[in-house]
Every structure is written in C-alpha cells, then in structure tokens.
Amino acid sequence: MARKPQVRATTPARRESILKAALDCFIGQGVEATTIDDIVRASGSSIGSLYHHFGNKEGVAAGLFIDGITRLNADLLRKLKRCKTAQSSVRTVVTQYSDWVTAHRDIARYLLNSRDIAFPPETKDQLREIHRSHIVEVFRWFGPYVRDGAMKALPIDTYVPIISGPIQDYTRYWLAGQVKESPAKVKGVFADAAWNAVRG
C-alpha cells in the first residue's frame, strides 16, 4: 500500500506563518531583541525555511513591513473606489485608516514604530516605489474633484498631511496608550476636520 504523503504547509502559508510569528515576537520584545531562533520556535518552521523566504532577520522585518503597508494601501483603495463624491472620498481616507488600525493593532503598531529599523537599500527602494504607486492612484482618484472645484486646489504635497496626518497622529498616541478614546469613537471628528480643510 502506498504511503500517504505528509501534509506540509504550502510556500505562501509557510511565509505567512513566519511573518505572523515575527510580528508577535517584534511586538512582544522588540525587533532588536528578537532572534532568528525566537521566530523559528514561534512559527514552527525550520531555520532553512526562514532563510529561504527572507534571508535573515532583517529580511523578515522588511517583508513584514512591506506586507503590512501593501495591505493597508490596498484596503484603502478598495474602499475609496466605492465612493461617489469628494466628501465621501475624503472622509473614507480618514475613517478607513482608523478602522484598519483598530482591526489590525499589532501590524499597525509595527508600521508606526518601524522608523528606526535599518532596512537595506533595496527594501528602501521597494518602499519608495510602493509609496509612489499608491500616491499616484490616490491622486488620480481625487484629481477630478480638484479640477471641478469640489476640493480646493492646494500644493500637491499638502493633501496627505492635511487629510491623513491628524488621524495618523491620533492612532499612534492611542496605540501607545497616551489617549483614552479609541479611534472608532473620534474618527468622525477627524473626518469632518479633513473635509472642512479641503472642501471647495
């Protein structure tokens, strides 16, 4: 009788399990203090599998950041493209960010607190391209609203800080335990402020 093949995690599933374990370790003890062995134990993977997917701990940290920011951007664009007006679009940028952070606290905390991680040059280049591509998509969406006067014509680099900056700051304070009210309770305040700042 032929032996049944052993069920093993597929490559995407293994990669995902390593990233999830790494996130737990990074949040629990910090990126610097986390070792490769910590991630291997937490994920149940082999060290060979980790090196195959990511190369080293810095590669895991970079992969986790890229994965998180890509999901955040994709979720925003998906919601944004359901909007019918300038007002609903601006408000969605704010409320979707708030909702995403609330639903994905650990990865949001990692994204917001990863500024000091020494990503390799190729990761920095990839992140710049991800950011550029995302901003192009967002501005392509809002461009017609600016042209038809529904939104103010402002210097292009000011829209993101005006619309997204305040809610990003608030969620950072909330994740750090510096403010009490959850973003869900105050997102409407920030959405109103963003719309009032850019409405035509």
Features from the language model and the residues they span:
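Amphipathic alpha-helical packing segments from all-alpha helical-bundle domains
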Residues: 70-73, 77, 121-148, 157-161, ...
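Generic hydrophobic, amphipathic alpha-helix propensity
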Residues: 14-22, 39, 64-68, 72, ...
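Hydrophobic/aromatic-rich alpha-helical bundle segments in the mid-to-C-terminal region
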Residues: 106-113, 124, 146-193
